[in-house]
């Protein structure tokens, strides 16, 4: 953990950060002030910290390495003259695995926030300081002591309750005990509003987390591989889709939501969730070769079709990123096509009923 982020991942993280900012400017015509980012423990292990590097870079902070190695011994502020853009406020939603595995990185991220908050810079180039000053003022009016208000205003790392895992959304969708996106957003906020840092471990701060969500203009999740996509695991929609629903619930509007890919460290790519969904739909879900490959696996292959439909629906329920043509094409290929439907029914009757 003390070799994260590595020098190599720092380069990738800077590239991811620059491309995220560029894409948002392209979409909205302005630089983002507040970003909500997902951090997975497994991805952190695989990449040696691409996500951590990006978060630090967005805040305008970089690692200090020992001599020529990758051992991180501290952080330093990137001067504004070198950064050439404002310091962006980043809220991090970590997974349970990350919480358990990387407490040292939680403290590193906390240190980054502390460094930036102490800078004598105008608020228009330091959005972390801007948000903290506003929040401290609000908390003082609510009766908090100054030291406590300052402490709360620096909270940026959040996750599920200690000893638990997940995002609270998947269970709700599968149980059908929900009616609106707001229900899903509230569930995500309730499950994710536990702050982590050097002096607190899972403290429930739902009001504070809701404020962070309300200000978030962007949600982003990075990938380091092309071997799995966002329609292959329910983790994707429960964590990222749930995050989108939480921002919508807290702010009343949808954030710009992106999926970045750093499988080629020399050429990272970023797409909106809608663009990524459309790409997966055309390249895999509707590709005859995919279904033919599933047929070799009988019962399990038919189950994969049903699982795909569940995940697709989960994304639409949380993020409303599906388009009508996608539902039409899935129905046409797997339900209305008699040959395909009968194969699924023969190999796994429960799968075809669930898809219906």
Task: Describe these PLM feature segments.
Residues 1-356:
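Ligand/cofactor-recognition surfaces for anionic moieties
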């Amino acid at each position: 953990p003390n070799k994260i982020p590595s020098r190599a991942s720092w380069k990738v993280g800077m590239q991811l950060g620059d491309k995220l900012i560029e894409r948002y400017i392209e979409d909205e015509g302005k630089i983002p002030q507040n970003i909500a980012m997902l951090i997975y423990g497994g991805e952190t292990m695989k990449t040696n910290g691409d996500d951590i590097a990006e978060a630090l870079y967005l805040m305008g902070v970089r690692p200090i390495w020992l001599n020529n190695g990758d051992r991180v011994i501290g952080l330093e502020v990137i001067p504004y003259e070198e950064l050439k853009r404002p310091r962006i406020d980043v809220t991090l939603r970590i997974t349970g695995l990350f919480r358990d595995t990387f407490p040292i990185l939680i403290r590193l991220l906390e240190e980054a926030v502390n460094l930036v908050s102490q800078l004598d810079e105008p608020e228009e180039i330091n959005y972390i300081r801007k948000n903290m000053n506003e929040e401290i003022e609000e908390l003082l009016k609510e009766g908090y002591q100054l030291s406590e208000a300052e402490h709360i205003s620096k909270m940026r790392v959040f996750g599920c309750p200690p000893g638990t895992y997940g995002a609270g959304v998947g269970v709700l969708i599968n149980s059908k005990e929900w009616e609106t996106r707001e229900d899903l957003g509230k569930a995500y906020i309730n499950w994710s509003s536990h702050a982590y840092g050097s002096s607190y471990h899972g403290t429930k701060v739902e009001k504070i987390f809701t404020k962070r969500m309300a200000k978030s203009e962007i949600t982003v999740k990075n990938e380091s591989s092309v071997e799995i996509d966002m329609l292959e695991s329910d983790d994707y929609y429960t964590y990222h889709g749930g995050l989108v629903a939480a921002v919508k619930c807290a702010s009343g509007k949808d954030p710009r939501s992106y999926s970045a890919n750093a499988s080629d460290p020399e050429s990272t790519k970023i797409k909106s969730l809608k663009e990524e969904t459309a790409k997966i739909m055309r390249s895999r879900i509707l590709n005859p070769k995919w279904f033919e490959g599933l047929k070799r696996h009988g019962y399990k292959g038919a189950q994969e079709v049903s699982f795909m439909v569940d995940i697709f629906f989960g994304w639409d329920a949380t993020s409303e990123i599906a388009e009508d043509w996608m539902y039409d094409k899935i129905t046409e290929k797997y339900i209305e096509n008699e040959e395909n439907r009968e194969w699924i029914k023969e190999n796994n009757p429960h799968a075809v009923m669930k898809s219906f």
